[in-house]
C-alpha cells in the first residue's frame, strides 16, 4: 500500500501502547490524529475504561477538544467508536484507493493468551461482521 497509513500497518498490538513500535486502539487513534492532522485525543488507560466515571471523563475531554458525534457519513480523519467483547474500541476512518475503511489496532490473542493482533485497515462492514457493534462516528470541528 502506497499511502501515509502504511507506516502504522502491521505494528503489533500492546495494551496502553502509544507507538511508534506498538499500539493499542486508543494509542493508534491518538498518534494518527496528532501526526496526520495535529489534533489531540486525551489518554484513556485500562483503568479509565473499566469505570463509568472514567469513560464519562474521557468523553467530556474529547468534547472539550472539539470532537462531537455526527450522524453524517464518515470521512477520512473521523474517529470510529464501537463496542467489542473487550469493551470500547476506536479507530480512524481512512481513504485508501477511493475506499473508506478503518485503521485500527486489533487486540487478538492466541490460544495461550499471547497478543497476536496489530494495526490493520479494513472496511467497517467487515469489522461489524466480526463482532464490533454500536458504531458511532466522531468528527473534530
Over which residues does each language-model region extend?
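Glycine- and charge-enriched low-complexity intrinsically disordered segments
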Residues: 115-141
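...with weaker cross-activation on analogous glycine-rich loops/strands in unrelated enzymes
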Residues: 46-124
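N-terminal capping segments
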Residues: 1-65, 85-89, 132, 138-141
Amino acid at each position: 500500500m502506497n499511502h501515509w497509513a502504511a507506516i502504522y500497518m502491521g505494528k503489533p498490538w500492546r495494551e496502553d501502547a502509544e507507538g511508534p513500535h506498538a499500539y493499542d486502539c486508543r494509542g493508534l487513534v491518538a498518534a494518527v490524529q496528532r501526526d496526520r492532522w495535529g489534533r489531540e485525543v486525551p489518554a484513556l488507560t485500562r483503568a479509565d475504561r473499566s469505570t463509568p466515571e472514567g469513560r464519562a471523563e474521557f468523553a467530556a475531554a474529547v468534547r472539550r477538544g472539539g470532537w462531537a458525534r455526527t450522524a453524517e457519513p464518515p470521512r477520512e480523519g473521523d474517529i470510529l467508536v464501537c463496542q467489542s467483547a473487550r469493551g470500547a474500541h476506536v479507530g480512524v476512518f481512512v481513504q485508501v484507493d477511493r475506499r473508506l475503511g478503518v485503521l485500527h489496532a486489533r487486540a487478538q490473542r492466541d490460544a495461550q493468551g499471547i497478543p497476536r493482533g496489530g494495526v490493520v485497515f479494513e472496511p467497517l462492514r467487515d469489522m461489524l461482521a466480526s463482532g464490533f457493534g454500536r458504531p458511532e462516528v466522531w468528527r473534530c470541528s
